[in-house]
Every structure is written in structure tokens, then in C-alpha cells.
């Protein structure tokens, strides 16, 4: 049967897609086709705008026909229209498989109805988002009720210590919280409960937290797991307190304490839309009322502008890195900018004006207009743009029922989206889209965005343009370079000429070549004026070569001359920084923000930033998570190095920050690995059933443990767990606890060390674990303690001096610290200790110390391994700590050499003068090491450098180890 004449109403490029579905549709039985005949125009439109609708029509034609004949597509639903039928269907669910099947079929049926009405009937987008939100709310609440009843049969019902019955509260964040859920969105949830206590009336009692954690886990699986029938909603729990490392369900008291003591600006932003959607709704709303002072400050909070600006800048960087210019949510002039405009007023003034404490964006926008906070015209333009963008978002997502805000890359996809939007073709749709995005971007810039510096005017660049273009003779070019302050004119001229004549430049595309031709004269003039060396020029030209095929970086530098100035300075001062930026040009983005470039964030800000970045990455996108971790490390280490060069950070702070960065990444990696393992195998079993946390910790040794990391430091790690006995994990695929923790450790190492296009994060050395490479990858705390007490060598106790817990379960970390203290403060035979420490030092020097050259003298001094160097000081510190900690346990409270030396001086083990002298020399040697590392040079100096300090260390060694 030929397609109806209405086919000609659609762009020709999508005719093949429509025809394909129509041909399959025509294979249905004749009587079915006859029943559909009055709906052919709508069927044709469905084929044109949505693969999801088309596939469901072909898969379940009788169901679709019933839907059309009952006129369901013509009426708006209420919440009860979702709840009543699902509750009735679930009343017959006898086992969990029934629950999962019924939920998924119900979701598919109702989502078909919603998307049909949205894309075929063109109902108001607010009707669509409200109905999707009601669908999600219904599925969550009905699934929760079924699972709660099922669990209560085994464990009884939760009660507070006062005997009051307890229910889980499910808080919806984001779009669901505001009743604005997209047709293909995931749902952001937080689980909480009123009070601690335990279950009553079951075969086995559980404390409330354990009960609600299990309940939450089963609810997530019921909604999120993909079966043969599909899924219900993808669930994201990362907005809960402490993120992925936090408990799945917290009591109200714990929730309030977290937000009052540790809540971040971005969490204020997230809580604006929070709403209780399932479980004890009344209790949930009471909790949210108690949290309002955290979200809405009593004073006018202008700091909210900077917080949202920082969030937006972070998103912009991500958009640039991922090439998401076509993303109508996070891209320029997109939905997120409108949300930020509205929410900045809410956060600033919501504490003083309760009318701004709304979840719905359009209602809040109207309030801003009424209050005169936004001009009437601006509010109208933003409202119109928002509705257009949300409709476009639905058209994009409804195409395949996928969560995406990216404009289709293919012509057919764009034309289908345009048809769904009511346009004759993509061209007209794009014109309207560009108009709205420009409008939103302008309003955002007026209200929130910082002004970018204007391109620097350079009236004297004619000569530099001629030099780059090759229009100057060599002597003229070199004279220009010399006159402008460049001493190595010939070398620079030759390097520039070689680049210009290279095949890569000759074969550049037009846009890239134009950007290069604009950039190079500015670069050359800036180089000359800064009196840059040939080496600096060589480094910068290497960067230019690296970005020839990614000329957007050249555009970035053309538009931000301040960034070019910073770039030249950094490249002149550090070969290491130059190498980092050449291999990872994305780091150029950091130069746009000189404020943050020279002020590295503290630990709290680091954790907060990384957590926000990871929240925006789908849970199942491992590759993107790994890339984000690698960029995070490189960007923040660059900030430390830049501050180091500018001398805004002293040596000890440099090491502190480098260590903070490592700890932050390790914490995130542990959380990611734990979540993956638990999802696959369930949680480890514990003899104490009340335990339900991670019971795993990472111990840092060496530079990490001693808070003394440098730019190229690797990680010396030991993994410990707190499980005992022969128990197994709780998942369907159950494995022994020891196997679980071993695989967890392997996963952590994999995430840290796997080389991607961006390299690895850190190299990891596990040889300091009990029994070294032949030992278990992860030991129990008790086994670790037994090994340290009975089997460890003296050098292993030396290593323990510079160890500390850096990530994981607080309980296991505390247990390790106790073991460390007990081992380090035990009594030792002084003579035996002295001999063993000296023997180990001799072995190290013989293996790693500098060997004489043909003249019989060492050619250089190795700062670390040679006599009078860093290792000598470290060995003296470790020896003194092991020798005297039994009498002065305060010596080993800290794990870093400086504070141990200070403690040795305070205790009188070393004289105060000697302790201070050792601290000064140790800092001096390490400062030289840092400077050399920033030049990509080994930690070596000339044999006649630092002679006095080295000789003093050697003499003090003799004094310390004198019999």
C-alpha cells in the first residue's frame, strides 16, 4: 500500500525513514490496517518524528489502536490516572520479577502516550513535563510500597527508639523535584528517614539504617536495572550527602548536620528544587523546611552570583573539551543559562522574599518580573526562549527515547526534529534557535557572566605579520627581532621559518590557517618584547605545532591576550609546564583564569570541584570518568607549579597541595571502584550485621604518606580491609570477602594507572604491603598488625614512620593509626636498630648513589641518594623515631619529616639547633629538587654546590650513628 499523500508535507530527506516504517506498518493484518485508517495522518507524523513511537506502533499495534480509539491522546491526565492503574496491576505481583515486569510495561505504555501527545498532538510542554514527573513519582512510590511490604515480612517494620513507626522518605532533586521532568530524563534522588532505631515484628531485626539502605538498593534496582522489558527510570544517587562515598540513606539528624556543617554552594543550588515524592511525604516536607535556612540566607547573598558563575565556567570548559556546542542544555544560550539566571536571584534574595522559594522555573520567572528584579521585556524573552528550548529538548529526546540534548549531527535527524517542532525544515528551526540562544546569552552576560577582556589592539604588528608571512629578508627579520629585545634572533628566525614552511602548516584548512596567521605575529612580538630565549621560542612553537589541527586553541589565545602573556612567562620559566601544556593543550583553558591559576584551592574546595565534575558524568561512562580524573590532576598540578614559579607558595605548601590533589583523586577513585564492585557483587558480609559501610582503607607511604609529594611522584600504597571470618558478599553473584577486596584493590589500581589518550593519573607502587609483591594485595587490619609485629623487617618499620591513612572508611583508618602507633612506639634494641638502619643505607647507596667517572670522581651530586643528601636525612629521622618513640610517642604523631624533626628537637633527642638546621637543609635540598623537576631535569647538582650543607649532614650522620 502506497504511503498517504501527506508524505509530501514532510522534507524529502526524511521520506526514506517514513517509507521504511510505513512499509513495515503495511504488513499488519488487513483488518488492523482498516481500523487504523482514520489515524493515517497521525501515524505518518509519528513515523516522521520519533523512532520510539514508530517501533512501539509496529511492536504493539493493538495496544496503540486501543489507545487511539479510547481518545486517551486527546485528554490531559491527572496524578490519579497514573497511580490507580499501576496500584491495581501491582496488587497481583507475587514476586520481584513480577514487580519489575509490570513497572517496565507500564512505563513503556504511559511514555508512549506522553510522547505521542507531545510530538503528534503538540500539547503544551508543561503538560508533558508534569505528566512525565507524575509517571516517575508513581513508579517510585508504588515500587517503594511493594518492596517495603516484602521486606517487612522478613525483618518487621522500622521503629524509632521511642516506638514510632518509620518510613523511608524519597527526595526528588532537579527536574523531577520541580515537576519538570523531560521525556527521557534520569531521576536524581536522595533517601532519608526520620530517626534511628530498629525493626520490630520480623524473623530477624535490623537497625533502621541497614533496613532503609537495603530498601533503597532494591528500589534503585527495581527502577534502574535493564531487563528484557527495558528499564523504568535511570536513577542517579550522587547528589546525596558525601556523594558516592556517603551512606545510601541518612537519618534526618545526619542530613541536617551535613548541610549545616559541610553543605556547598552547588548543593544550595540543587536543593532549590528538592521535593518529597515517595514514602513519608509529610515528614519529608518537614525536613526540607528545616533545611531552608541552608538554601535561602536571611541576608542578600551576592556570593551566590560568584558561585553560579564558577559553576557555569566549569560547565563551559567541559562543553569546550567535549565539543558540545550543539548542546541546547549546557551550551551557550541554553537551558542551563536560563536556570542560572533565575536561580541566582533565588539564592541571593530567597531568604528575604519567600515568594522566590519556588521550584518551578516559569513561576519564579513571573515572580522576578513582578518584583522588578528582571525587566518585563527580559522576563518575556527568557520565558519564550525557555519554552522553545524545552520543546526542542523533547523533540530531540523523543526521537529515540534517549537522554540527550545534542542537536542531531545528521541531516535526517535534524529535519525530523524540525518537523516535530512544527517547522517546514531545519533551516527555519535553526534560525529561531540561534535567535533564542543569542538572546539568552546576552541576558546571562548582563546578569552573571564576567566580562572577557577585549582583544589587544596592536597597531605596530605590520612588521610582525610580514615576518611571519615570509615577506621580510632574513637580515630584516633578524634586525626586527634584535631591535625588539630578542638576543637569539637568528635561531628564532630559523625556527619560525621552519614552522611556516612545514607541510603541516601548508596543508592546514582555511579557518585554521587564518587563526594561525592572526596568532603568530602576536606571539612573535610578545616573545621579542619579553626578551624570550630561543629555548622558550622552541617550546612555544612546539605548542603551535601540537594544535595546528585543533585551531580552536589558537582562537582562544587570539581572543585572550592576557592568556598569551601568561603562557610565554610559564614556558620561559618551566620546561615541565611547557611539556604538560604541549601534550595536553586543554590546559590552556586554565590560563584564562589567572585568579585560580595562582591560588590553588584547599582540600575542601578540591573535593567539591571534583565531585561536581564527576556528578555531570553518567555512572556507566567509565572512559569519561577516567578522562575527567586525568584532566583534574593535570589542571591542579599546573596551578601549583605556576604558584611555585611565582613564589606565592612556599616549598612546604607546594608539597601540601600536590598531596591534597593525590588524596582527592584517591578518594574519588575508591568511591567509584567501591560502587562498581558493590553493584556487581553486593556488599561484603560482616560478622557484626550493624556494619554497612565500606570497611576498606588506603594507606599512603613514602612521599604521599609524608605529605611531601613533588611533580613527578608516584603513589606508594597499601590496602587494608576490616572484614573477618569466611563471609561472602550479598549480591546475586556472591564472592568471598577476600576475593571482593582483592578485586576492589585491582580496580583502584586500574583506574589510577591505566594509560588513556591523556596518559595515566599516577604510577602506583604496592611493594610496601606485607610480604611485598608475594603478599596479598589487600590485607585485613589484623593480618597487617600481626605481620608488623612478627615478620616485618626494620626497613619496613622505617617505611611505617612515613605512612598514614589517606582514604576510605574512618573506622579502618583509625584502626590503622593505632597499629602504626603501637608498632612505632615499641621498645627496640638500640645497637641492633643502628646496625640494621646503617646496613640498609649502605645497600641503597651502593645501588643508587652516583658512581665515579673515568677521572675517579663523581660527575655530579644526586640530591636524593648521595652522601649528605635527602635520603641521609630521612634515614636519620626514621632511626631517631624508631629509637626514641617508646619514650617520646609524640615523635611519631606526624608522618612528615619536618614535623618529626621538630618533635625530636622538642623532646631533646636532637638539640633544637641541630633539628632546625636539619629542617633548613632538608627544605633547601627539596626546593632544589622541585626547581629541577620544573625544568624536566633529574635531581642532580654540580659537585661544588651546597658543599657546606652536605658536609654538615654527613658530619651529623656520624654523630647520630656513633656507637
Curated annotation (Swiss-Prot):
It catalyses: [glutamine synthetase]-O(4)-(5'-adenylyl)-L-tyrosine + phosphate = [glutamine synthetase]-L-tyrosine + ADP; [glutamine synthetase]-L-tyrosine + ATP = [glutamine synthetase]-O(4)-(5'-adenylyl)-L-tyrosine + diphosphate. It is an enzyme of class 2 (transferase). One of its GO terms (molecular function) is [glutamate-ammonia-ligase] adenylyltransferase activity. Residues 461-963 are annotated as: Adenylyl transferase. InterPro entries: GlnE, GlnE_rpt_dom, NT_sf, PII_UdlTrfase/GS_AdlTrfase. GO terms for biological process: regulation of glutamine family amino acid metabolic process. Its cofactor is Mg(2+). SUPFAM superfamilies: Nucleotidyltransferase, Nucleotidyltransferase substrate binding subunit/domain. The keyword Membrane does not apply. It comes from the Bacteria. NCBIfam families: PRK11072.1 (NF008292). PANTHER family: BIFUNCTIONAL GLUTAMINE SYNTHETASE ADENYLYLTRANSFERASE_ADENYLYL-REMOVING ENZYME (PTHR30621:SF0), GLUTAMINE SYNTHETASE ADENYLYLTRANSFERASE (PTHR30621). Involved in the regulation of glutamine synthetase GlnA, a key enzyme in the process to assimilate ammonia. When cellular nitrogen levels are high, the C-terminal adenylyl transferase (AT) inactivates GlnA by covalent transfer of an adenylyl group from ATP to specific tyrosine residue of GlnA, thus reducing its activity. Conversely, when nitrogen levels are low, the N-terminal adenylyl removase (AR) activates GlnA by removing the adenylyl group by phosphorolysis, increasing its activity. Belongs to the GlnE family. This is Bifunctional glutamine synthetase adenylyltransferase/adenylyl-removing enzyme. It comes from Hahella chejuensis (strain KCTC 2396).
